[in-house]
Amino acid sequence: TLFPYTTLFRSGEIYVKKIPSMKVVDIANSVSKDAKQEIVGIRPGEKLHEQMIGDEDALHTYEYDGYFKILPAINNWSSDASRIGKGKKVPVNFRYASDTNTEWMSVSALQKWIKDNKNKIGNN
């Protein structure tokens, strides 16, 4: 499904959906708990954590139920009450990343999600 807030989109805004984080090992175990796993270390270019909103964007970021909205810094749009609506300003040092996320998806929850979404992700 398309992000359900598309009717809210206005020029220059960035929407970031709140989603649970998960560990690569948990993803592997969700797909096949019997698959052989080998720890090889971090490879060139590989990241340990994914950052969706950095602290440099916190000045223009507001929190809503289910998502964050980053407002454009130009033309004072980030202080426009009609763009902010019912949003709550995030703290100055805020970042939304997999290592700071408080919501984590368990192996069983991921297995259920995979089962429920087979038609969207395929059978391989």
Where are the model-predicted features located?
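Short, small-residue-biased leader/transition segments that mark boundaries at the very start
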Residues: 1-8
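Glycine/proline-rich active-site loop of Rossmann-fold NAD(P)-dependent oxidoreductases
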Residues: 9-14
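Acceptor-substrate binding/catalytic loop of class I
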Residues: 16-19
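Accessory helical-bundle/CTD segments and flexible terminal tails appended to RecA-like ATPase motors
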Residues: 28-31, 40-43, 47-124
